[in-house]
Regions:
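Sequence context of c-type cytochrome heme-c attachment sites
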Residues: 8-102, 107, 113-136, 155-173
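C-terminal segment of classical bacterial N-terminal signal peptides
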Residues: 1-9
Length: 173
């Protein structure tokens, strides 16, 4: 599991594991913004995750950073590792649709989407997972939501999970 989380955060894949490109939120939007998919993209856009990178430019973030001796939170490793997807990923792992402006996007939790984003693969969960899809769990969240974070508040996984829930609606009929 750690290896998958490391890849989702943009670190190199361990030996013997495939490396896939990060396609960015745009790569997910086409399919995951439909009513049939529960408007999952809109749910993400309304979340703090989508604004995580931009939040580092706020006066509050700059104040917290200054207290920690950080000059620019939008350029510091301690901040970026949790405020954007694919931090430290080599350029060859970033598709042209990837953008740091996406903040903590789909691929932060679900892994690089290059291979599993195709509809024919996503229709089969097992096949999608074989092509890099990660089904996140509490450890995934706690890789960032932990006491090392300067603005940490107690993290209650079951409550947090409800705030970011984006299930696919059950088929009608």
């Amino acid at each position: 599991f750690f290896a998958l989380t490391a890849v989702a955060q943009g670190q190199a894949a361990p030996a013997g594991k495939a490396s896939y490109k990060f396609v960015g939120a745009k790569g997910c939007k086409m399919c995951h913004n439909t009513a049939a998919q529960g408007k999952q993209f809109e749910i993400w856009m309304a979340s703090k995750h989508s604004k995580a990178y931009a939040a580092l430019a706020s006066p509050e973030a700059k104040k917290v950073a200054a207290e920690k001796g950080i000059a620019d939170p939008q350029k510091d490793e301690k901040c970026l590792k949790c405020h954007l997807t694919a931090y430290k990923a080599p350029k060859e792992m970033l598709a042209t649709t990837y953008s740091i402006e996406d903040g903590v996007s789909c691929e932060s939790c679900h892994g690089p989407g290059e291979k599993y984003k195709d509809m024919k693969i996503m229709k089969d969960k097992k096949l999608a997972m074989e092509n890099g899809l990660i089904m996140p769990d509490e450890k995934t969240c706690k890789s960032c939501h932990n006491p090392e974070r300067p603005t940490y508040k107690e993290f209650k996984f079951e409550e947090a999970k409800k705030l970011i829930a984006h299930p696919k609606p059950k088929a009608q009929g």
